[in-house]
A protein has these predicted regions:
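Bacterial N-terminal signal peptides
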Residues: 1-6
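Cyclophilin-like peptidyl-prolyl cis-trans isomerases
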Residues: 9-219
Length: 219
């Protein structure tokens, strides 16, 4: 009976995994079941080979790497990217505090608050968090800010504060963007990409390209 229960629990926890093969190395991500619309949309695009040959077109050191702009596939050097999309948006699936912007988190990009007050996600552009480590004082300030922005509905847990202090991330994004996955292998590749030299618009001088993305497992 115990074994059967364990097997059932394991099956419920199984997550879809995607391998992103890049010119800098491979990044393996697991998609959260708690964000089903984002998970299914991402898997659909991967299976359609949408991400193959696209660039990580926006890279900011100690912050994140962003890819998925369809205009980046054949973009000439020096062209500013980031406006390409698929013409639809995804309803927000913000599951904070369960999933948050720790180092390695995978989240969907979106338009700004003024034009997008419901925090709807872009259909295809995603980012992987690198971030930085924060001091206790930093986290106290960010906690006050989050509390104010959410009218007291959100706050950082002790575990999150510890993670941001010891491992790092981008806590200022919490509660405002949908985190739909996390890197489970290849953070050294993310680290290398986020260190790359960029132009004035955060595009890498030397293109970092997604060779292909493929689904590894499916629930």
């Amino acid at each position: 009976m115990l074994s059967a229960c364990c097997i059932c629990a394991s099956a419920q926890e199984q997550r879809t995994e995607v391998m992103i093969e890049t010119t800098a190395g491979n990044i393996r991500i697991a998609l959260h079941n708690e964000t089903p619309a984002h998970r299914d949309n991402f898997v659909k695009l991967v299976n359609e080979q949408f991400y193959d040959s696209l660039l990580f077109h926006r890279v900011i050191k100690n912050f994140m790497i962003q890819g998925g702009d369809p205009d980046s596939k054949k973009a000439e050097p020096g062209i500013t990217l980031g406006e390409g999309t698929l013409g639809y948006k995804l309803p927000a699936e913000i599951t904070f505090p369960l999933h948050y912007h720790k180092r390695g988190a995978v989240a969907m990009a979106r338009e700004g608050d003024e034009t997008n007050p419901d925090f709807k996600s872009d259909a295809c552009q995603f980012y992987i968090v690198w971030g930085k480590r924060f001091s206790t004082m930093d986290m106290e300030r960010l906690t006050q800010r989050l509390d104010s922005a959410s009218n007291g509905k959100m706050t950082f847990t002790p575990e999150q504060i510890k993670t941001y202090r010891k491992i790092g991330g981008s806590p200022h994004l919490d509660g405002a963007y949908t985190v739909f996955g996390e890197v489970i292998e290849g953070m050294e590749v993310v680290e290398e990409i986020q260190r790359t030299d960029t132009d004035d618009y955060d595009r890498p001088i030397d293109d970092v390209r997604i060779i292909r993305a493929r689904v590894i497992t499916r629930k």
